[in-house]
Amino acid sequence: MAKEIAKSLLDIEAVTLSPNDLYTWSSGIKSPIYCDNRVTLGYPEVRRAIRDGLSQMIIEQFGNVDIVSGTATAGIPHAAYISEKLNLPMNYVRSKSKSHGKQNQIEGAVSKGKKVVVVEDLISTGGSSITAVEALKDAGADVLGVVAIFTYGLKKADDMFNEIDVPFYTLSNYNELIEVAREEGKISENDIQTLVEWRDNL
């Protein structure tokens, strides 16, 4: 599954590699990889594969789940597809509370006392996922863990999830993506070294 998802992400250019002309993330980090999993929404076959893979992952890793929770905004559609497939209630979590109305940070199914799994599109440093986890915990949820489409495999993310004692699982990952890109001739051996060093040194 990890290899198939990595290939799909590369084929539809949801993930692009540029070892010699770095991208700039919104955080200011210079990176040889850019991931925009919102692109998957335009490809029903890829979208369904992600839905089915994450649904199976939730069942296998967490068993009995009460609510599927998406991170705003990119995790919301995938959470909706999964909750429909698993016939579960859904909610989503904003990065911060609204400044008007009821000032809700969480919209949808009530989380208090419920077993919740968070759906994210991408794990980079883990910051947005952990914001969602903490908001759900503050609302009284029992957060079982986080699932996502892809991870860069950054040590910072591992450290942050370990710190809050919440596991995360992804359908594919940076190492798998690099291997698929190598097999398809999209990157050279020198590029691979650049990509690995970037990840290990970040």
UniProtKB/Swiss-Prot annotation:
Keyword Transmembrane part of the UniProt annotation: no
Catalytic activity: orotidine 5'-phosphate + diphosphate = orotate + 5-phospho-alpha-D-ribose 1-diphosphate
SUPFAM superfamilies recorded: PRTase-like
Binding of 5-phospho-alpha-D-ribose 1-diphosphate, residues: 94, 98, 100, 120-128
Cofactor: Mg(2+)
InterPro entries, A to Z: OPRT, Or_phspho_trans_dom, PRibTrfase_dom, PRTase-like
HAMAP family: PyrE (MF_01208)
Name used for this protein in its record: Orotate phosphoribosyltransferase
Species of origin: Staphylococcus haemolyticus (strain JCSC1435)
Lineage: Bacteria, Bacillati, Bacillota, Bacilli, Bacillales
